[in-house]
């Protein structure tokens, strides 16, 4: 496979062409990744039962925490790689690659050990009941066992994309997606492994994709590659990776905290069925947010390179185009949630499975309408937060990430449900989205004004 876009062209090609070239592969990959999570849930819902969906939903906080550590390394390394290439420092970019490998081994090994040791107490804290903890435990034991594979696969894929190979990054991710979709029904229905089969399919598919990534960086045709001497931790590189990736890390941690509070509230006011309904809503929303994430991934190397080269006019242009596309995506999600909520919920659960299944469908349909009611502006808020991260301003990105989850959403989740029940849980989310988007607009306004007043100002990182 030939190199899709050389780093040097990031500073000269048309922004719209670059965004399409980088974003489309990322969108396809991220959407496919979200779709196979949806397919997992559909197979689990129809092959194991509606309460099994609740068990997987209870696993989401722990999976988000695992993703937090993966994002801390992967997103930080990708942004730093783009900036180093924009500065013309190819060897420094390869040093980042070496640090990524070592950091993933250390962090993932520690997370796996702690997670497996304390799994049952963690799941009970997350809101598991006697009916759901068995499903959650069976699923997470295998997912935790594959944490090193997952972290390494996702981090290296980020660096592949950031170093000028968006199509190859897409192909690698699609490899995992296709294998997962093939293995899931085989393991769940063919081998009768149930929910453990779904987890095993995910880990094995990612292991296959990781092997392709390792081959890429071992090839002499890669712009940056594995070399002798790069596999040593450098405090300065690790510090910058963590600094840039901290916003994504905190966002995932906050997302975990939110899901924990949501699950606890739903268990109190709606029971296990309501938790499963939230699992459905979460996966539907994530389908559209993964498309926005693909747009952000396409934006990242273009922003990082041109920011490193001090081409601020191009930075603003790609930001504007990305925001427009993101708002269109989330508006589509809004329309789906308002027009076809019950039909969407029935994809995951068969109403013929009994009263619990029908209750889950009805609860999910109500939640979809409310949770997605301000979804159009969510795309803008997410792009803005990522933009600050990509230009090396992690403090602003962290602030935006924290305020939506911690300052607005969690307090609302603590205040509204005692008065409104499950309705209060659903209402908390769009209220938090609206206020966070307004705050993001204010910060972005001042940042854009700085760029326009100082078009050639230097910024080191």
At which residue positions do the language-model features occur?
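Short alpha-helical transmembrane segments in multi-pass integral membrane proteins
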Residues: 1-23, 81-148, 190-246, 303-374, ...
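Membrane-helix interface/capping residues of multi-pass secondary transporters
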Residues: 41, 50-53, 90, 119, ...
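Residue-level signal for short hydrophobic patches within transmembrane helices
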Residues: 12, 16-35, 39, 62-69, ...
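Short runs within selected transmembrane alpha-helices of multi-pass transporters and secretion channels
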Residues: 143-161, 172-180, 198-211, 296, ...
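Transmembrane helical elements of multi-pass membrane transporters/channels
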Residues: 21-40, 142, 176, 205-209, ...
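Small-residue-rich hydrophobic transmembrane alpha-helices
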Residues: 53-113, 150-169, 278-341, 378-397
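Helix-terminus/linker motif at the lipid-water interface of multi-pass membrane proteins
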Residues: 35-54, 123-130, 186-193, 253-283, ...
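Hydrophobic transmembrane alpha-helices of multi-pass small-molecule transporters
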Residues: 65-68, 112, 180-184, 210-214, ...
């Amino acid at each position: 496979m030939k190199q899709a876009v050389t780093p040097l062209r990031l500073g000269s090609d048309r922004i719209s062409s670059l965004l399409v070239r980088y974003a489309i592969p990322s969108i396809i990959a991220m959407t496919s990744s979200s779709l196979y999570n949806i397919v997992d849930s559909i197979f689990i819902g129809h092959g194991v039962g509606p309460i099994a969906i609740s068990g997987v939903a209870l696993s989401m906080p722990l999976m988000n925490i695992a993703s937090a550590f993966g994002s801390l390394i992967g997103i930080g390394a990708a942004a730093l790689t783009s900036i180093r290439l924009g500065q013309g420092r190819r060897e420094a970019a390869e040093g980042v690659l070496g640090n990524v490998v070592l950091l993933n081994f250390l962090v993932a090994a520690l997370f796996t050990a702690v997670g497996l040791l304390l799994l049952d107490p963690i799941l009970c804290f997350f809101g598991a009941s006697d009916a759901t903890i068995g499903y959650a435990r069976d699923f997470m034991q295998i997912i935790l066992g594959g944490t090193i594979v997952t972290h390494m696969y996702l981090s290296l894929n980020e660096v592949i994309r950031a170093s000028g190979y968006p199509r190859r990054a897409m192909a690698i991710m699609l490899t995992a997606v296709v294998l997962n979709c093939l293995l899931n029904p085989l393991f769940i229905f063919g081998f009768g492994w149930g929910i453990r089969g779904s987890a095993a399919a995910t880990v094995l598919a990612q292991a296959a994709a990781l092997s392709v990534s390792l081959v890429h960086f071992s090839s002499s045709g890669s712009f940056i590659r594995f070399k002798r001497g790069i596999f040593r931790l450098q405090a300065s590189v690790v510090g910058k990776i963590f600094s840039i990736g901290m916003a994504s890390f905190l966002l995932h941690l906050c997302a975990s905290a939110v899901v924990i509070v949501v699950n606890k509230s739903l268990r109190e006011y709606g029971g296990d069925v309501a938790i499963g309904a939230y699992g459905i809503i979460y996966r539907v929303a994530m389908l559209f947010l993964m498309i926005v994430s693909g747009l952000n991934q396409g934006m990242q190397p273009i922003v990082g390179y041109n920011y490193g080269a001090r081409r601020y006019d191009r930075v603003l242009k790609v930001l504007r185009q990305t925001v427009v596309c993101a708002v269109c995506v989330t508006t589509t999600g809004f329309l789906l949630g308002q027009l076809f909520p019950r039909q969407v919920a029935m994809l995951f659960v068969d109403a013929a499975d009994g009263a619990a299944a029908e209750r889950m469908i009805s609860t999910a349909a109500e939640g979809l309408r409310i949770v997605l009611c301000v979804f159009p502006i969510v795309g803008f808020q997410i792009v803005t937060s990522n933009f600050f991260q990509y230009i090396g301003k992690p403090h602003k990105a962290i602030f935006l990430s924290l305020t939506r989850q911690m300052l607005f959403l969690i307090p609302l989740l603590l205040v509204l449900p005692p008065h409104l029940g499950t309705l209060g849980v659903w209402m908390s989310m769009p209220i938090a989205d609206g206020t966070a988007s307004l705050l993001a607009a204010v910060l972005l306004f001042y940042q854009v004004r700085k760029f326009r007043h100082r078009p050639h100002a230097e910024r080191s990182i």
